[in-house]
């Protein structure tokens, strides 16, 4: 004798399915279908949980990566600032041993050269700017000189030189014509006969 199996499965309307005797094959099939549906529901729930876990992992990984990259960029900027500070400190250390020229006699100016401060840095920056301005002026003078020399060369090559060549050629041709003509002028010697 088979025992009666009673299964209570929640349907869409939250209603309990009443127990049925397993005498007919239809009831057996329905019970098997109910068990299969339960298994499928469990599998679907597991899949959903896996998907949720994978999504959360993706979010965590992406957030962590973004945070790490931003922290790396911040660290790189800090290293740049530190290197600039080190350069400034080296400049200041060298300025401590720099003596002023002989024309500076006051104690304040002497002290300003011995102790690095903002005024000293400003003085160095002004010197750099003056050097840059001098270089720019020299470059401008060089370009002006090059321009004038090119203009003079072009004038000589394309205006004066052809005139000189043409004048000399015409003068030579005219002298030759007079020299070999049957009636030479009186100021030229007679042509050889």
Swiss-Prot record:
It is a single-pass membrane protein. Residues 1-144 are annotated as: Disordered. Residues 29-86, 119-140 have a biased composition (Low complexity). The keyword Hydrolase does not apply. It comes from the Eukaryota. Keywords: Membrane, Transmembrane, Transmembrane helix. Coiled coil: none annotated. The chain crosses the membrane at residues 158-180. Residues 103-118 have a biased composition (Polar residues). One of its GO terms (cellular component) is membrane. It is found in: Membrane. The keyword Coiled coil does not apply. Disulfide bonds: none annotated. This is Putative uncharacterized protein DDB_G0286829.
